[in-house]
Design a protein with these regions (language model features):
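Structured, soluble regulatory/oligomerization domains located on the cytosolic or IMS-facing side
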Residues: 46, 60-168
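Short, glycine/acidic-rich beta->alpha junctions
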Residues: 36, 45, 55
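A structural micro-motif recognizing beta-strand termini
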Residues: 33-36, 101
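Membrane-contacting alpha-helices and adjoining membrane-interface segments
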Residues: 1-34, 66-93
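Short beta-strand-centered aromatic/proline hotspots
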Residues: 50-56
Length: 168
């Protein structure tokens, strides 16, 4: 009788430990569904995972990355992590470094910086007052210009299209 009680206790302990994770995910899923820190279609980052939310259920949240892979995140992981909801942005930062050879004269460099600034300020994609073109450093083979501006979109797909247009 004692061994049966001990076995039943061990089975009960095993089941309760296994159910603990499920209960934690279920409760976290309920919190996510009620609090709504993100919705299906939103672009989020959780830890190393970034992508579009494609499904939210009581156990997990599915996120599709740019490379089309789908990450399944347990809701307890999501609810205990810092979630960056990029969809809540009203703009996105366009930024790159442009290397200019050292044999470029100062007047040429200043003209290039003025031309880049004027081009970005004239673009319908940018917030004019956010445009920045500065000499930011010196590389092994070039002077480095930091070129940055906020673009008038929060949508990742639209941002990538705008970025492509500006880069061309």
């Amino acid at each position: 009788v004692g061994s049966i009680v001990a076995s039943a206790g061990l089975v009960g302990l095993t089941i309760s430990l296994a159910a603990q994770d499920s209960a934690k995910n279920l409760f976290s899923g309920l919190v996510i569904l009620l609090d709504r820190p993100f919705s299906i279609g939103d672009w989020i980052s959780v830890g190393d995972v970034s992508g579009e939310v494609v499904d939210i259920n009581f156990r997990s949240t599915k996120v599709r990355a740019l490379d089309n892979s789908v990450y399944i995140l347990t809701n307890s992981t999501v609810s205990s992590a810092t979630v960056n909801n990029g969809t809540l942005r009203n703009k996105r930062l366009y930024r790159f470094t442009l290397g200019v050879t050292y044999d470029t004269s100062r007047p040429q460099l200043e003209q290039l910086m003025a031309d880049l600034t004027a081009m970005l300020k004239a673009s319908p994609y940018t917030y004019e007052d956010s445009v920045l073109v500065d000499l930011s450093g010196f590389g092994a083979s070039s002077m480095d210009l930091l070129v940055a501006a906020y673009l008038r979109t929060a949508d990742m797909t639209r941002f990538l299209q705008m970025q492509n247009d500006l880069n061309l």
